[in-house]
């Protein structure tokens, strides 16, 4: 296969010869993704996404390849980039590019490349044509959505690009300035037909809600992250398996007997803490929320502060979606050879920029660095502070991603086929009956048998016999 394949012109991938390997792994993943395969079977004949032009910004993994091919099977035209510079699996990108779908994703790409690729996934047709840009966005972390909003604002007011707050912002702002110098209405045209966005993760949802509250969100949005079958499965059970896989692949460290600090005890933090404890680490948790802190304490975790724990622990994991969770001062206090990593979306959970400014770096292998302080002490930083499970491992298992991506696919169908049911500028979650549908699609694979209510039982507790079974306020 590799002897006859040529890298497509409308793609940017590492090596097209990896396509056959990628295709073999995609076939295996399909057997572990019953939700997506059932959706293909249910909707393929109806083609509900025919006419959809989907700009996708989400980790270009084997599991994402199954999502992309599901969207295409339902009629969509798709262009794709990774939402993280380290998370691409190059064989997955090659396999999708080999089918003719434009893919812009290379593991270890530069930030300059990243923003170039994020621009290129909006180029569906010639300038001025009806299908020039997308009519849907599928986002993870909100960068594709951010690009449209910030670029359109900059068309009218260049001062919004005047004061970047970080190196990544400097590169983003430079990319927007370059695009505007080339085409002064590019962002307005590309965003003109966008019906809505479906957002995968906590960080991106936060951005959407912020824009919605300010009245600046330009299109409809569905918050996929807060579907129960996403947040309580991907965030919890996915991280429970992929965190330690990433740490182990990167360091080969013995986790048993170590002291590990998990910063944050939301769903991601809960899964991370459980995983480390399962390997017999002594796990401590930091929290800002008294409810989450009490949950951690009731599960037997010691609840501490970073200031108290910095010089005592061996492994540190950030899970919060916030900034400056592990500071330069914390890292100065750490033991020699302490391991520091992040499983939240962005690298600013750890003050990596200050490490770059004040310390020497020595690459041990890709995505594993010794950071050397002036006194000679070294810490091991994984994935340069970006997602450790995808930077140093292969991310979540296929089965749990089937839950998340089934939600994404259903959300895309909902927004594209029923836009009148969703107001521009507002953020929605999928209704409970669709959440329950996603769960049903996965029960057979794990050998689960569902008990059915009798008519009398349903009437007694006041729910429909076929669901939904819980009020929207139920926490699971």
Swiss-Prot record:
It catalyses: S-adenosyl-L-homocysteine + H2O = L-homocysteine + adenosine. It comes from the Bacteria. Its main location: cytoplasm. SMART domains: AdoHcyase, AdoHcyase_NAD. Substrate binds at residues 61, 140, 200, 230, 234. GO terms for biological process: L-homocysteine biosynthetic process; one-carbon metabolic process; S-adenosylmethionine cycle. Its cofactor is NAD(+). The keyword Transport does not apply. HAMAP family: AdoHcyase. Belongs to the adenosylhomocysteinase family. This is Adenosylhomocysteinase.
């Amino acid at each position: 296969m590799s002897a006859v394949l040529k890298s497509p012109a409308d793609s940017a991938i590492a090596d097209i010869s990896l396509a056959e390997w990628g295709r073999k792994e995609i076939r295996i993943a399909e057997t572990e993704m019953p939700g997506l395969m059932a959706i293909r079977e249910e909707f393929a004949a109806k083609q509900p996404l025919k006419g959809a032009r989907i700009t996708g910004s989400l980790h270009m993994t084997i599991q994402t390849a199954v999502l992309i091919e599901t969207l295409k099977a339902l009629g969509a035209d798709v262009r794709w980039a990774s939402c993280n510079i380290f998370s691409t699996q190059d064989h997955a990108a090659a396999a999708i590019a080999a089918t003719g779908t434009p893919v812009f994703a290379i593991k270890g790409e530069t930030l300059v490349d990243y923003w170039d690729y994020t621009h290129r996934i909006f180029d569906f047709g010639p300038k001025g044509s009806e299908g020039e840009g997308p009519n849907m966005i599928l986002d993870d972390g909100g960068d594709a959505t951010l690009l449209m909003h910030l670029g359109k604002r900059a068309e009218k007011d260049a001062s919004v690009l005047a004061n970047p707050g970080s190196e990544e912002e400097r590169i983003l702002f430079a990319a927007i300035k370059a695009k505007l110098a080339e085409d002064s209405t590019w962002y307005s045209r590309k965003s003109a037909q966008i019906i809505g966005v479906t957002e995968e993760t906590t960080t991106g949802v936060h951005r959407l809600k912020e824009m919605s509250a300010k009245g600046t969100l330009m299109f409809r949005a569905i918050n996929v992250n807060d579907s129960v079958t996403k947040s309580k499965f991907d965030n919890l059970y996915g991280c429970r398996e992929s965190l330690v896989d990433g740490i182990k692949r990167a360091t080969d460290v013995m986790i048993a007997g170590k002291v590990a600090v998990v910063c944050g005890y939301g769903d991601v933090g809960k899964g991370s803490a459980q995983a480390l404890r399962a390997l017999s680490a002594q796990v401590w948790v930091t929290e800002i929320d008294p409810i989450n802190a009490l949950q951690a304490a009731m599960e037997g975790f010691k609840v501490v502060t970073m200031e108290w724990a910095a010089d005592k622990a061996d492994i540190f994991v950030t899970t919060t979606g916030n900034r400056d969770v592990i500071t330069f001062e914390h890292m100065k206090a750490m033991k020699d050879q302490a391991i520091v990593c992040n499983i939240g979306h962005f690298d600013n959970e750890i003050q990596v920029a200050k490490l770059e400014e004040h310390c020497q770096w020595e690459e041990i292998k890709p995505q594993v660095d010794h950071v050397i302080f002036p006194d000679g002490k070294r810490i091991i930083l994984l994935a340069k502070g970006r997602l450790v499970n995808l930077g140093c491992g292969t991310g979540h298992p296929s089965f749990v991603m089937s839950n998340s991506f089934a939600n994404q696919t259903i959300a895309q169908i909902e927004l594209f086929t029923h836009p009148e049911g969703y107001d521009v500028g507002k953020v929605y979650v999928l209704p409970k009956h669709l959440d329950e549908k996603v769960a049903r699609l996965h029960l057979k694979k794990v050998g689960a048998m569902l008990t059915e209510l009798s008519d009398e039982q349903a009437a007694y507790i006041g729910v429909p016999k076929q669901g939904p079974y819980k009020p929207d306020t139920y926490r699971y």
